[in-house]
Amino acid sequence: MSITKEFDTIAAISTPLGEGAIGIVRISGTDALKIASKIYRGKDLSAIQSHTLNYGHIVDPDKNEILDEVMLGVMLAPKTFTREDVIEINTHGGIAVTNEILQLILRHGARMAEPGEFTKRAFLNGRVDLTQAEAVMDLIRAKTDKAMDIAVKQLDGSLKTLINNTRQEILNTLAQVEVNIDYPEYDDVEEMTTTLMREKTQEFQALMENLLRTARRGKILREGLSTAIIGRPNVGKSSLLNNLLREEKAIVTDIEGTTRDVIEEYVNIKGVPLKLVDTAGIRDTDDIVEKIGVERSKKALEEADLVLLVLNSSEPLTLQDRSLLELSKESNRIVLLNKTDLPQKIEVNELPENVIPISVLENENIDKIEERINDIFFDNAGMVEHDATYLSNARHISLIEKAVDSLKAVNEGLELGMPVDLLQVDMTRTWEILGEITGDAAPDELITQLFSQFCLGK
C-alpha cells in the first residue's frame, strides 16, 4: 500500500462474510456519490443532506435488475471517518448479495480497498494519529471490557495528547536553549542554560518512566496473561481448566497421561484475559506422543506469565511434586491444593506460603484464585484507573524506552560537563522518537506495515 498513491475511490465489504441480518458495503473517495448514483434507485443523492439514511434499491443498470432493497447512508467530507465522501450501503446480510453489490460498485469506477485502507486514509487525512488508528484494531480485538476501555481511551486521543504536549515542551526547551546559546554575552547564560536543560530533561524522563510503569498492566489487559496449569498427571489440571472455562474443553479421565498435548483456551477473569495452557503432566515417560507433550509443557512453563501449580492434597508429596515446586519457584506462581473434599494426606509445612486449598469437584475457593491474580499483577489496586493513560502496545513501549535512553544520555552528558549544544542532539532525538509513536515522524514502511494488519473494510 503506497503512501504516495493518488486517493482514488475505494470500496469493500465492512461486515464479516457470512449470513446475517445486515451486510454493509462501504465506499470512500471523491467519486463515492457519483458511483453510488449509478446503481442506486431512490432519491437523488446529489440533493440529499449529509449524514442521512435513505431507503431505496440497488440496481444493475446494464440489466435493469434489482439486486436488493437497501438503506443507503450518505456522509459528505470532511465530517467523515476518512474525511472523504463516504457511502455505506446497508444490505440484507449474506455472501451472495453483498458480493454482487461490491462487484457492481467496482465495475462502475471504484477500486477494491486494501486491508486497513479506510483507517489509513483517516490517518493520512489528519482525522486520527497513529496511536488512534492502532486503537481501532485494539478495540476490534479486545477480549474483555477492560481491554475495550483502554482502547476507547486511546481512540479518544489520551496518548496522542500526552505525546504531542511532551513534544511541544521539548521544542520549547530546545528553542530556549538555542536563544541562550545565541546570546553568550551575558555572564550567567551558560549556567542558566545548563540548569534549564537539566530540569526539563529530568521532568521529561520522569513523565516517560511513569508512562512505562503502566505498560505491564496495559499489556496484560490488551494481550492477556499466558497462564500455564502444571502438575503431575491426574491431579486435576484439566478439571481446573474446565472449571475456569465453565465448559468441557479438555479431556478429563482417571487414566494418567490423557492430556498428551498443550491445550489453550481464553477465559475472562475480572476483566483480564487469561490464556490458559493446560499442560501434559510433567514426568518421565517412554511414550513418544506423551514425551512430546511433556517437552511442550516445559516450554509453556518457561514462557508463562503466571503458573498455576496443582497438587493433590489427598496424597503425600511425591518426587515429581517437589521437582515442579523447584522448577516453578522463580515464576509468578500460585500453588493450589486440589481435592480438599478428600481426607488430607499432604504435609502442608513442606509447602511454600500462601497456598490455596481448592476442590475443583465442588467448585470450592476458585474465586480465591482470581483474587490472588489481582494481588500478584495489580498490587490489589484494581484493574483500570479511568483517568490514567496506559501503554499497552509493544511498539509504543519500545519507543518510550528509547526516548528514556536518549534523555538519560542528556543527563549523563550534563553530569560530565559536556557543552549543551552537543546535548541538543539527544534531546532532538527524543522529540523524533516520540513523533514515531503518533506517526508524525514514522517511516512510510512502518505505516504500510501497520495498516496491512487491519481487516478488509476497516
UniProtKB/Swiss-Prot annotation:
SUPFAM superfamilies: P-loop containing nucleoside triphosphate hydrolases (SSF52540)
EC numbers for this chain: 3.6.-.-
InterPro entries named among the record's database cross-references: G_TrmE, GTP-bd, GTP-bd_TrmE_N, GTPase_MnmE, MnmE_dom2, MnmE_helical, P-loop_NTPase, Small_GTP-bd
Residues noted as binding (6S)-5-formyl-5,6,7,8-tetrahydrofolate in the record, renumbered to the chain: 26, 88, 127, 458
Binding site for GTP: 234-239, 253-259, 278-281
Residue numbers binding K(+): 234, 253, 255, 258
GO biological process, one term: tRNA methylation
Source organism superkingdom: Bacteria
Cofactor(s) the protein needs: K(+)
Ranges for domain TrmE-type G: 224-378
Recorded GO MF terms: GTP binding; GTPase activity; metal ion binding
Short name of one Pfam family: MnmE_helical
GO cellular component: cytosol
Top EC category: hydrolase
Keywords on record: Cytoplasm, GTP-binding, Hydrolase, Magnesium, Metal-binding, Nucleotide-binding, Potassium, tRNA processing
Primary site of residence: cytoplasm
Family statement drawn from the similarity comment of this UniProt entry: Belongs to the TRAFAC class TrmE-Era-EngA-EngB-Septin-like GTPase superfamily. TrmE GTPase family.
Free-text function comment from the UniProt entry: Exhibits a very high intrinsic GTPase hydrolysis rate. Involved in the addition of a carboxymethylaminomethyl (cmnm) group at the wobble position (U34) of certain tRNAs, forming tRNA-cmnm(5)s(2)U34.
Subunit organization: Homodimer. Heterotetramer of two MnmE and two MnmG subunits.
Name of this chain's protein: tRNA modification GTPase MnmE
Gene: mnmE
